[in-house]
Amino acid sequence: MAKKTVAAKKRNVKVDANGQLHVHSSFNNIIVSLANSEGQIISWSSAGKMGFRGSKKNTPYAAQMAAQDCAKVAFDLGLRKVKAYVKGPGNGRESAIRTVHGAGIEVTEIIDVTPLPHNGCRPPKRRRV
């Protein structure tokens, strides 16, 4: 006889007017997350979630679509001001921040938190096409 599984309860996240915008932009994808002031995620989106595949995922347009989807949900829940934390070397960093600002959420600060190695791992070799 199969065991009955209980569906996990959805957490209730407290949304106040101030929050955080996290933009993670890699060479292959872009992930946009909006969190409350304590760091609990309110909404998130990515270029892959928006239906982009392959090399189209790391474009400014894909970042714009992901940020628009994420910002609309958070704005409806009551988020109005954010600090933007940007991480990674990808293309759509500025595009995502502009889109969130255009959706009615005020961006008060932009902070670059890209991790920089102090000569750690060897980088991948150059492509020869």
Swiss-Prot record:
Part of the 30S ribosomal subunit. Interacts with proteins S7 and S18. Binds to IF-3. PANTHER family: 40S RIBOSOMAL PROTEIN S14/30S RIBOSOMAL PROTEIN S11. Belongs to the universal ribosomal protein uS11 family. SUPFAM superfamilies: Translational machinery components. GO terms for molecular function: rRNA binding; structural constituent of ribosome. It comes from the Bacteria. GO terms for cellular component: ribonucleoprotein complex; ribosome. It comes from Phocaeicola vulgatus (strain ATCC 8482 / DSM 1447 / JCM 5826 / CCUG 4940 / NBRC 14291 / NCTC 11154) (Bacteroides vulgatus). Located on the platform of the 30S subunit, it bridges several disparate RNA helices of the 16S rRNA. Forms part of the Shine-Dalgarno cleft in the 70S ribosome. Keywords: Ribonucleoprotein, Ribosomal protein, RNA-binding, rRNA-binding. The lineage of its organism: Bacteria, Pseudomonadati, Bacteroidota, Bacteroidia, Bacteroidales. One of its GO terms (biological process) is translation. This is Small ribosomal subunit protein uS11.
